[in-house]
Amino acid sequence: MSTVTITDLARENVRNLTPYQSARRLGGNGDVWLNANEYPTAVEFQLTQQTLNRYPECQPKAVIENYAQYAGVKPEQVLVSRGADEGIELLIRAFCEPGKDAILYYPPTYGMYSVSAETIGVECRTVPTLDNWQLDLQGISDKLDGVKVVYVCSPNNPTGQLINPQDFRILLELTRGKAIVVADEAYIEFCPQASLAGWLTEYPHLAILRTLSKAFALAGLRCGFTLANEEVINLLMKVIAPYPLSTPVADIAAQALSPQGIVAMRERVAQIIAEREYLIAALKEISCVEQVFDSETNYILARFKASSAVFKSLWDQGIILRDQNKQPSLSGCLRITVGTREESQRVIDALRAEQV
């Protein structure tokens, strides 16, 4: 008699799933953490809501209204969730039939699009980007049949560049009446002029993902947003959990999105951009660095000689970067989060000492 294990009882696609390797899952014992695109120092908040005996609102009014005002959209066009990652999954759950529909994305890019789809049992299709990391529109057109959700990260993680807005428009026309196009704007605060939020009235099938994890310095809060037309938001409300945000999270998010909170965020962005340019200039002068790519974000992608050895050497010194070698077209590349000046100097000094 054969013995059935607990794993045997699991869904086949879950048994075969490779989970997303987050920075925290990968571990490390560093004191310079530059692998998760977090803000380098903590921002202090005081809790003002003391009603922890009551369930929170599903969509806290103050958070929704503050974010709508900040993003320049109507409150009815905003959904708040447990990070933008939940927004990624909600869109698949609302629009894709497992075993029938597909999502489409463009590697090298963020890994959670595929993980979310595979968890639900939805097919993943990819069209690798062109050599300049822009969209291959012909390749996309050839693969759209049966696709319900298209993910485009702009600025793209991990490459750091914006997607050409004209290409976005062509994509939105190709998919009109066929699929939802999701612009992942997790890093848009570092290049706000490039946001597509103003396009929502023109394209009813456009959705935009946002987060408080990066420029707002609240990665530990797990608070993200989906901006879309009311019809899309109403569908997402059918599949979201009844209480996605805890009371403390909603409390802090509302404070972060107050007028003074927005001013503080923009000051942080200016500081990170200045530090980014300092680090880029220094990296370009280091012998083990082959190429430094332009960035519109709070991280830098660079190609190294003997990148695996460099990565391990810095790891052993307590400087934790993100290895991108396994991503398509990113052989030899490491991603470096922009931290404090002290952290930048640690990276620069360690790289200058590398003998490769």
UniProtKB/Swiss-Prot annotation:
Q: What is its EC number?
A: 2.6.1.9
UniProt keywords, alphabetically: Amino-acid biosynthesis, Aminotransferase, Histidine biosynthesis, Pyridoxal phosphate, Transferase
- Pathway of action: Amino-acid biosynthesis; L-histidine biosynthesis; L-histidine from 5-phospho-alpha-D-ribose 1-diphosphate: step 7/9
Task: Give the cofactors, semicolon-separated.
Answer: pyridoxal 5'-phosphate
GO-annotated biological processes? L-histidine biosynthetic process
The superkingdom listed in its UniProt entry is Bacteria
What positions are modified (N6-(pyridoxal phosphate)lysine)? K214
Q: Which InterPro entries match?
A: Aminotrans_II_pyridoxalP_BS (IPR001917), Aminotransferase_I/II_large (IPR004839), HisP_aminotrans (IPR005861), PyrdxlP-dep_Trfase (IPR015424), PyrdxlP-dep_Trfase_major (IPR015421), PyrdxlP-dep_Trfase_small (IPR015422)
Tell me what reaction this enzyme catalyses. Answer: L-histidinol phosphate + 2-oxoglutarate = 3-(imidazol-4-yl)-2-oxopropyl phosphate + L-glutamate
Write down a Pfam family by its short name: Aminotran_1_2
The cysteines covalently paired via disulfide bonds are: none
Family under the similarity heading: Belongs to the class-II pyridoxal-phosphate-dependent aminotransferase family. Histidinol-phosphate aminotransferase subfamily.
What's the subunit arrangement here?
A: Homodimer.
**Protein's name in the database:** Histidinol-phosphate aminotransferase
User: Per UniProt, what is the name of the gene that codes for the protein in this document?
Assistant: hisC
